[in-house]
Amino acid sequence: MADGMEAHSMAAPRSLRIAWFSDLTDAGGISSYCSKLLLPILANEHQIELFSESFATTLLGLPNHHYLKAYSCHREQPFDIFFYQLEDGAAARFVRTYLGIMPGITWVHDLFLSDLGAEATHNSPWEHSIEQFYNNSLPFAARSIARHNAWPRAYREVALSPITLFSSQYGLKEISTMISSRIEAEPGAHRAEYLAIPISCAGISAPPQHAPLSFATVCRPGLEGRAYKFLPALKGLGSPWQLTWLIDPAEQSAAEILIREFSVVDQVTLVLGRSPEKWSEILSSSHVAIHLSSTALGHLGPYLQLALGSGRLAIVSDTFHGEEIPSTSAFKITPGIHEYAQISRVFEAIQKTQLRTLTLPAQKMVASENDPARIALCLSKIFQESAPQMAIIMQRWQALYQSAHVALLAEVKELTSSSELNEIDVYKELLSQSFLELGWSS
């Protein structure tokens, strides 16, 4: 009897229905890379359906729907958790839009964004919507008011996410004091924490130790990528060296201008199409990875972690995302007037000594922090712990959602019903059926 009771108390957590919103098409995207590593593990524990911009019925071996079908799928068989991966770029813009329609758990890869996004995103009265979440009797915000942000940040997306995960310690630190109000099941229940990006170093082989010193970088050719600092430092090395520079096609012209300016055309090879897979191939023939980036935009992962995890020496800027990297795991450079001199000294030290073998601390760090099985276990635990809170929030949000439908339907009906100006009743003949398909009732 006692054994039976103990077995019952240790029963496995129930399988949850997860709506997984993520860009799955961008080969160089963080969301796509994380999904490929985590979904095969998480799908063994939970019922996961993908929502993307693709119309394919299956992606990564799981059911896939176009994201505009999410509401109807949820109505037919409700999801326990809506999960979003938020990153910069046009390919993931739909995620920014939809998480304002249905709150959930958001994994923020990029807190600072390069564009304002769609009209529904940057002109959203999200702060007023949060007030309505707690007081459904408030009137809806006027749509005629422009609410443009001076600089695109994911404040709206974080505030509308009861549980927010950050793949960068820098992003988590920056957001802690920036948002005063957010959606919560109860005061103080909002959860924000760091969740590392998973990586796989499988297939990355060790480079020849006796070959000429070989460098690799994914730095962008703009000022923030610091190429105008590290290219002349490389040129100053006395012995032979090679650099493989992985860039996006749109960056090719700027990169070519730089390598001509510093007369290193013969030593630099440009590879087009930045992606973790191509980076892994490049690392197999590289000794040192250059990750000098001095900007809040973008992310060092998974490229830096792949370099460290595969035993490469790495050089990072000691600002923004580079601050979180321990000095025992990478050479850290301070941007500024002494930056070139620091980079040159590091290159010379690597060239003259056996420093390229001193990578064990970094490998241990990555093996522990970025293991896909560990990340999947952490994420599954977050899903389980958050499910009761999300059920409360969903119920309250649904009431607000229906109120918005009623208000919009009344406005549309008034504007489109038959009159001397309309030969047909537009609402009755054209719109009512569409609204019913969306789950809206008049």
Residue map of PLM features:
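Conserved donor-binding/catalytic core segment of Leloir-type glycosyltransferases
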Residues: 19, 165, 207-225, 244
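A conserved mid-protein helix/loop that constitutes part of the nucleotide-sugar donor-binding site
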Residues: 32, 222-236
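Glycosyltransferase donor-sugar binding loop
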Residues: 55, 242-255
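A short, active-site helix/loop in glycosyltransferases that binds the activated sugar's phosphate group
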Residues: 147-191
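Nucleotide-activated donor-binding/catalytic signature segment of Leloir-type glycosyltransferases, i.e.
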Residues: 255-274
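Acidic donor-binding loop of glycosyltransferase active sites
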Residues: 283-298, 312
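C-terminal amphipathic helix plus adjacent low-complexity
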Residues: 360-442
